[in-house]
Amino acid sequence: MNTYLFYDLETTGLNKAFDQILQFAAIRTDIRFNEIERHEFYVKLRPDIIPSPQASVTHRISIAKSMQQGICEFEAVQKIHKLINQPNTISIGYNNLKFDDEFLRFCFYRNLLAPYTHQYKNSCRRMDLLPIVTMFFLYKNDVFKWANSDGKICAIMYVMKRIEIKDHV
């Protein structure tokens, strides 16, 4: 049975080779979007990492929180690898093909795990919501409410959180 794994990463910066994951969150659903399981954990900051100030302002995860509540990167990456490589998983994110997925591949490689198996092995696949959301905005604009409280057009993930997916399936 196929399952969807909606996931997101918070990182110390944008450089997939030199930054690291600080937080991982995922929700696995069946094909009808019924929640099966939920995962969220912090990752301890490695000693060789200096977080980007911009990233810290964006995600608001302090170094103290990371160190107190986080697990080591090796353990975190093993958990992520197991989740994302579960047979018949379709991993889904928002801009994940250009950012999160590349970040994960570097983390998997750095921690001695197969970096590409979540893309093909065990009937696993991946999908990015960003191009789909863009197509809706351009060609079927009336389906979603696109403006934030200020009336400005906003297509980031927190807007999508307001949408009840089941109403549009």
Name each model feature, range by range.
Residues 90-99, 103, 107, 144-169:
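Acidic, Mg2+-coordinating catalytic module of metal-dependent nucleases/exonucleases
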Residues 106-122:
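A short alpha->loop->secondary-structure connector
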Residues 35-38, 119-125:
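A short coil-to-beta-strand element that immediately follows conserved catalytic motifs
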Residues 43-45, 129, 165:
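Active-site donor-binding loop signature of nucleotide-sugar glycosyltransferases
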Residues 123-150:
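Short alpha-helix plus adjacent loop in nuclease-associated cores
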